[in-house]
Amino acid sequence: FCQMIKDFQTKKVDVGRVNNEYFINVLAAGMLTDIAYKVPKDKKAVLGKMAYYLEGVKEFPKQLSQNMTLTFNSKEYSGTEDIMLFLVANSKSVGGFADAAPLASVSDGYLDVMIIKKMALLTEAPDLIFKLFQGEHPKHPSIEYFQTKELSVLPTEQTAGIAIDYDGEILEEGLPVDISIVPEALNLIILRTTN
């Protein structure tokens, strides 16, 4: 224990802010981002991670037809898109994918935004999945990937209520949202690195 205390250092890390709430890892909205809330506790207890996959398979056809047309505004990107999903990440790892946001860092002062536009599932999705496992998905034509300090996301008239998840919590007020980075907001205790 004494050695552990001796060998620690602190590192300042950024935190994301959405309206009046905060997140460390990720904010997401769109397809399948609400699965964790739909899986009954008894299924989670019996099936573990498999319960999430089964719920995703069940929900996928329903959510595929959901209209999600959103307007994104930042210095780096502005546009109105028909989307399947969008992520705002503060770290590389999202939802079990180690490099979902390959340029992200918890201490760079930026949020990484990935907008996955609606696409033809039979022709475009397989290529996107292949690129995802290679870490090349930001280059896919159905993806907008950029880094920003601030982002506003607005619903359009056609868009129904979309669940917004931030680090496992549901943002009750939904859209519109203002998202920003709070640089060096937390001090983390980590093992000392030798340089």
Description of each model-found segment:
Residues 1-85:
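Catalytic core of DAGKc-family lipid kinases
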